[in-house]
């Protein structure tokens, strides 16, 4: 039976079970209203779209009606941190408060778990792992005797950047399935059995969509069947769906296939039934083709469409060889007389790569884009849908009783028009916008200088670097500086590196987790970052007291996927800037602001160094989408804000917990 409103209030109300069991509980009307809206969605079998600002108590707002309903649910998040919070904090808290036994299971992406087949294979050829010592192997063997699911996070002694884990982790490409010698002892299989028996399974978006694709293929499933889906941090859904509904082939995949196959060939020894020479020749040809692809794209922009010159290259003999040799590997490894499950696994991998390559090269559908991406480690070739609304309706919306999509950043200018159109959400939709519980008027200050040049001016980067230097000295470090390009990031780093008095960290110097750990530990440090640091950074307290944004975060029209989507919007007679670029930038800026205020005790300055937010006609949409914050244009106001903090601290009132 679905819960009624009284049941929900008995848990979340001002005198409810949470209030009685949780010291310092603060009743939030918005949390109760959100839970009631979701309860209605569960009862009526409807989709629910919710923006719940920071401090709303969003996770308990959806957990409560779902738990009370008794329905089987999968909760998907954009970040591992939120997964951990739900599983290890929110679910136990709700269980203690209600006295209910909540059967919940945390399930991460497969690369977070050890593969016994790869581990045994690596142990048989330890020379291939370089620095992995006998001591490491001994500790791993002992751990495998004790662990339940072989989760990477249990190995706190193994550094994040240690390449050892990449050699033994579970991957979809290298999974042998039921053919595997360790199938019965597989940690992932044990994890899935546990998940199948759980009422609530907590995953991330990548695993959620990987499951959709497996179910779409008709060959099994990763997650158990469920009635209710919750997409938390749903502002990421379009990007994740684009990746999973599309196709991708990378030079790294090709190189990994060759390396793994060569390792298996060596392990096969002198088996008389195994013809190694033809396979070795095919692997050598694949390696050469991968190098040719890297070489061709080395002199091209980092991202671009597969234009005529690129297609001409990809269709020449190099890629024809690649396709032919992949098929040859598939044939040689899949021969009936070979009963080696590892070789059959290589056959499947080679076949999948050959098929994906065909899709990418022969893609001429105007609703899809064939494009490439050049990274430090290699080249990726993509075929991506320009619109994911159709596949989402077919494979997600129509398969669930109720789907809840929620985030702190979904609405723009007070409505959900943008996210509804991008995700293809129907009319039978329940909507709710619940403002942040935090007092931005007293906790924050927004600084927008009027004396800086516009981003289109050639002196913008130098002038912004000077102003950031001034700001960070006023804030005494304690800042995250977010850029829309590496060019400006490097320009600012070059200036600050001369004589900046506080610890300075730059994205790319170390893995993301290492940088965030250093930044969090050192209160007066500064982190310069771009890209992924616009979201998913949780640093409450004084360490992050100033958030600086160099430019409004518009997606670059030079990005191939952005450009193609803009062209598609223009072709149907709509305005790509107003309908796509602007709302996406508003959501990105809201995400950035979410890094600054993470608790009711946090105080901080948001500095937007792009005057267009106050001078352009569209600037009002940014302000109407952000919480009410005092707006100032002079550095003296920033100094006064931080002086007030200093005075409050010296008077005995803590600024942060």
Regions found by a protein language model. Name each.
Residues 2-21, 71-199, 206-209, 261, ...:
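A substrate-engagement module of RecA-like helicase motors
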Residues 449-459, 509-616:
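Conserved RecA-like P-loop NTPase helicase motor core
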Residues 484-508:
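Conserved helicase motor "Helicase C" RecA-like lobe of SF1/SF2 P-loop NTPases
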Residues 2-50:
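Conserved pre-motif I regulatory segment
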Residues 73-79, 404-406, 477-484, 608-609:
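Conserved RecA-like ASCE P-loop NTPase motor core of nucleic-acid helicases/translocases
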Residues 68, 84, 89-92, 172-173, ...:
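Signature of the SF2 helicase/ATPase Hel1-core->accessory helical subdomain module
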Residues 39-40, 59-72, 89-94:
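Walker A/P-loop NTP-binding motif
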Residues 166-201, 212-220, 328-452, 459-466, ...:
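A contiguous, basic/glycine-rich beta-loop/short-helix subdomain that forms a polymer-engagement track
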